[in-house]
Design a protein with these regions (language model features):
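Histidine/acidic-residue-rich, glycine-tolerant segments that coordinate divalent metal ions
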Residues: 58-59, 80-82, 86-98, 104-105, ...
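Divalent metal-coordination and catalytic microenvironments
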Residues: 21, 60, 73, 103, ...
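A structural signal for isolated positions on well-ordered beta-strands in alpha/beta enzyme cores
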Residues: 50, 128-130, 288
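Metal-dependent amide/peptide-bond hydrolase catalytic core
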Residues: 211-402
């Protein structure tokens, strides 16, 4: 495994920044303190910055030579609305807020890369360092784009990276095509007619109608889509009634839909609406159907994914670069990949043993109240960013950008 010496030398100071950010987590579009830290570090290293895209986003601009080519490297900054269980020194100081997905570590790895790139500009072009807010449900990537990210900072491609616990450190994973699913939510309100539970014939009970809908939705997955196409419909919330002897007036179903293609998503939305409305009508009831599309699928472009694989192989060896199996989780970096070529990869965060060395106890999985980013990963992640940036400008410009 290869890491850059100057990054290793500064790793402790970057880890201290990471732990400070971890101790002061900020939720979607509230990342003011974190953005201030990022902006100060970049400015101290002589990197010009632009603030305000996506409300709290920060973009650093590292330029060298006379080349007009450019790429973007992205890290997310926000935390999650959950209570941390850890008791180490850098545990969250804010009740109900926690860096449980490692965005503090993502920020730290990109800062470490920024520090090196500022001092050792071994490339001809511009590297845009994109520190993004509000990945956890806020669509910060979408907001940065809407505020002119790619208009103000034209780039040939954009790259993102996420830590992945449970895999031995020193490994990467990347693949072309869909790597994360779209995330969508639905809400169905079934309107009936309440009454006494002893006299069901005088009312219109929404509960059996809801049960029919829940079962029928699964036939969309098993009978309406191709078996080789992935799709998940999960009814995760059922709200109805307040008393055992009263037939309720209404019943509410909520849940999520996840797919890897827009085509499958389109079909699922249409069929869910048809099933909901027709099932309600068959029982003499009505319903309101709401469907909200959140994050689109994250789809890596093939040339950029292969480029990443080669860079990773040069750092950790080809045997340690895994094919990324698609996951039904969602990621708003998808918006950036809809606008630009690029790739989203994963870097192994270790098996969790780093947490038994004075860093608390418990599992180290994402969105777990005992999670903590592995600081030993900072030099490797930062080395990857630097190697990727330098290698990008050594290859010919993409045809579309030429």
């Amino acid at each position: 495994m290869k890491t850059i010496d100057s990054i290793v030398t500064q790793a402790a100071s970057i880890a201290a920044i990471r732990r400070d950010i971890h101790a002061h987590p900020e939720l979607c579009f509230e990342e003011n303190r974190t953005a201030d830290i990022v902006a100060k570090q970049l400015t101290d290293w002589g990197i010009p910055i632009h603030r305000g895209l996506g409300k709290t986003g920060v973009v650093g601009i590292v330029k060298n030579g006379t080349g007009t080519r450019a790429i973007g490297l992205r890290a997310d900054m926000d935390a999650l609305p959950m209570q941390e269980f850890n008791t180490f020194a850098h545990t969250s100081q804010h009740a109900g807020k926690m860096h449980a997905c490692g965005h503090d570590g993502h920020t730290a790895m990109l800062l470490a890369a920024a520090q090196h790139l500022a001092k050792h500009r071994h490339f001809d072009g511009t590297v845009y360092l994109i520190f993004q807010p509000a990945e956890e449900g806020g669509g910060g990537a979408r907001e940065m784009i809407a505020d002119g990210l790619f208009d103000k900072f034209p780039m040939e491609a954009v790259f993102g990276m996420h830590n992945w616990p449970g895999t031995t450190m020193g490994k990467f994973a990347v693949s072309a095509g869909p790597v994360m699913a779209s995330s969508n939510e639905f809400k169905i309100t079934i309107h009936g007619k309440g009454g006494h539970a002893a006299l069901p014939h005088l009312g219109l009970d929404p509960v059996p109608v809801a049960c029919q809908m829940v079962s029928a939705f699964q036939t969309i997955i098993s009978r309406n889509k191709k078996p080789i196409d992935a799709g998940v419909i999960s009814v995760t919330m059922v709200h109805t009634g307040e008393a055992t002897n009263v037939i309720p007036d209404s019943c509410e179903l909520q849940g999520t839909v996840r797919t890897f293609t827009v085509e499958v998503l389109d079909m699922i939305e249409v069929r869910m609406k048809e099933i909901a409305e027709h099932t309600a009508a068959a029982f003499g009831l009505t319903c309101d159907f709401e469907f909200e599309r959140n994050y689109p699928p994250t789809i890596n472009s093939a040339p950029e994914a292969e480029f990443c694989r080669k860079v990773m192989s040069g750092i950790v060896g080809s045997d340690n670069v895994l094919a990324q199996e698609p996951t039904m989780g969602a990621e708003d970096f998808a918006y950036m990949l809809m606008a630009k070529p690029g790739a989203y990869c994963f870097i192994a965060n270790g098996d969790g043993s780093h947490r038994e060395m004075g860093h608390g106890a418990g599992p180290c999985m994402l969105h777990n109240p005992s999670y903590d980013f592995n600081d030993e990963l900072i030099p490797l992640g930062a080395t990857y960013w630097v190697e990727l940036a330098e290698a990008w400008f050594k290859q010919p410009a993409p045809v579309a950008a030429a």
